[in-house]
């Protein structure tokens, strides 16, 4: 059974794909709730099938969609697979969204994998006149990472390039945690970032295991919700990284 999940704020896309797949047995187009991060694979599995991916799979490692009989594929992967079966040509180009307040001509552009960010930026008119470039983000605004320079290549997993001016890229000054719990409310996986941060500071492996730190999907919702402007998502990433490293070493 194949389920094509599309957020409900794209009704034309839902109608089109429903029409195109009407005669296909075992194919269902499903409208999904408009909430972030709806595209996370574990969220998709639960929304589309009602199945919950376990924290720990049969192998003893973190659970995967396959543990509940599901395979998640994004649109690009499915399209590329179809083209490969027809032509034998693998994934050699990537569609990249170039956006931000510092880019002259924001647009979607298809480029060969390996193209330098610098060349992609030039193809979009370069940096706006009179604007000082502050930061280049590869990926989206919530989960993307900062590039040290424009001399980095587009990889197959890159789907966005954001250019921010120095003003837009300026980081807010963090203040002390006020323990308001908004990071807990924002977490789609039901984690407790404020508690996990303390467990990580104490390097408490057992506590991090009990708090299910390995379920973090790095969506950035906790940082976005934090009124104290603390780098909560980065701390979660460090905590998960440390926990997984200890787990590989046989930590208990």
Where are these regions (language model features)?
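Flexible, glycine/charged-enriched surface loops at secondary-structure junctions
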Residues: 1-7, 29, 93, 129-139, ...
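Ferredoxin-type iron-sulfur electron-transfer modules in oxidoreductases and energy-metabolism complexes
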Residues: 160-174, 184, 188-224, 228-252
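Acidic, glycine-rich active-site loops and adjacent beta-strand->loop/helix elements
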Residues: 8-10, 140-143, 242-243
